[in-house]
A protein has these predicted regions:
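Multi-bladed beta-propeller domains
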Residues: 1-8, 17-21, 35-50, 78-102
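Residue-level signal for WD-repeat beta-propeller blades
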Residues: 6, 26, 53-54, 104
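Beta-strand C-termini and the immediately following turn/loop, strongest in propeller blades
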Residues: 8, 13-26, 61-67
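Ampipathic, surface-exposed secondary-structure segments
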Residues: 16, 28, 34-37, 43-49, ...
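Structural motif
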Residues: 22-33, 67-75
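Serine-hydrolase catalytic core recognition
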Residues: 54-353
Length: 353
């Protein structure tokens, strides 16, 4: 059960991660069901990501699928299609080719993307993990547009992995709650995913990188600092580095009261403490940190504290401050050039240049 969309006089409209009779979530799929005393009716018939709104007898079903770009909006009355809302959105120039799967013993939802021109005889590829990996952020979706940026990175010569480990939605309540007091478990799942997928896909485990933004930025920095045996380069965008500095309503939900246990839970899950780097491994790996100086969500102090701690520990790193940019990068020119800078950093760091 993902959400309650509408309550009718004699039925409910709900959003779910699996259809009737399914024993576990269908990887990347979100469906719309009509439920009444007679049973359930699945309004979304094709695999994909579906949502709906309803007013009286009319339902508008909005669908995204892997095979076509954008969204398709259908108008239904009494379960029958009466109209399709025309879309005038531009068609993307990239055609993603993700393989959706479940990785490892934990059955971690994952998507794998290879370069468009890749052939089986081309050999193993440098790896780029591209997770969000935290609460409220599902990245593995059966939707075309979800993989435009990952496919672009793949076309630069990488095998790209998007994995939704513990803490992400769409799996089960227990899956989401498994990270209580232990955000670092999300890193364990990325490690499990890449090792398991290497048994099925052409991955060069001697050249593994990771990039992410927000929670994904935290995860990317955590990866190169705590597991340099697995990750050889990382790009951390707008990372939370000290959980004491982030929103109370979010952080205390998962990590509890920072005053308890002498702050040990917060220190263990943060990248930096007042004493410097937190539980960093001895081996150094290249790390680029990117942060918008106008970010009012994850404030730039997070990156400044991490950079200061890295410098104090004698660890080389790169910091890219983005003047006038908030938590995301909606400016087209900035976003485009930022992608190019990231590819350049990854290729230099992995010896691909």
């Amino acid at each position: 059960m993902r959400g309650l969309l509408d309550v009718g006089a004699d039925d409910l409209l709900v959003q779910v991660s699996a259809g009737p009779g399914a024993e576990e979530p269908e990887t990347g799929e979100i469906h719309v069901l009509r439920v009444n005393e007679l049973g359930t009716e699945r309004l979304s018939t094709e695999p994909g990501v579906h949502g709906a709104v309803r007013g009286g007898p009319v339902t508008v079903l909005v669908s995204s699928v892997l095979e076509r770009p954008g969204q398709r909006a259908r108008v239904l009355r009494g379960g029958e299609e009466i109209a399709v809302v025309a879309s005038h959105a531009e068609s993307p120039v990239i055609a993603p080719r993700p393989t959706l799967t479940r990785a490892g013993k934990s059955k971690i939802p994952a998507a794998v993307l290879l370069p468009s021109g890749y052939r089986e005889g081309d050999g193993p590829l440098p790896v780029l993990l591209d997770p969000y990996g935290g609460p409220h952020g599902q990245r593995v979706l059966a939707a075309h547009n979800a993989y435009l940026t990952p496919q672009w990175f793949a076309d630069q010569g990488f095998a790209v992995i998007v994995a939704d480990g513990r803490g992400t939605p769409g799996h089960s309540p227990a899956w989401e709650k498994a990270i209580r007091h232990e955000f670092t478990a999300t890193l364990d799942d990325q490690v499990e995913a890449v090792h398991a997928l290497a048994e099925e896909f052409p991955l060069d485990l001697s050249r593994v990188s990771i990039r992410g933004w927000s929670y994904g930025g935290y995860l990317a920095a955590l990866a190169v600092l705590r597991r340099p045996d697995v990750f050889h380069a990382g790009i951390a965008g707008a990372p939370v580095t000290d959980w004491r500095l982030y929103d109370t309503h979010y952080t205390e939900r998962y990590l509890g009261d920072p005053a308890e246990d002498d702050g040990e839970v917060y220190a263990r899950n943060s990248l930096v403490t007042d004493e410097g780097l937190s539980a960093a491994a001895g081996q150094h790996r290249p790390l680029m940190i990117v942060h918008g100086l106008a970010d009012d969500n994850v404030v730039a102090a997070h990156t400044l504290r991490l950079s200061s701690a890295l410098l104090a520990a004698g660890r080389p790193h790169e910091v890219l401050p983005l003047s006038g940019v908030t938590h995301m990068t909606p400016q087209e020119q900035v976003a485009e050039n930022l992608l190019l800078l990231q590819v350049d950093f990854l290729k230099r760091s992995l010896g691909m240049a």
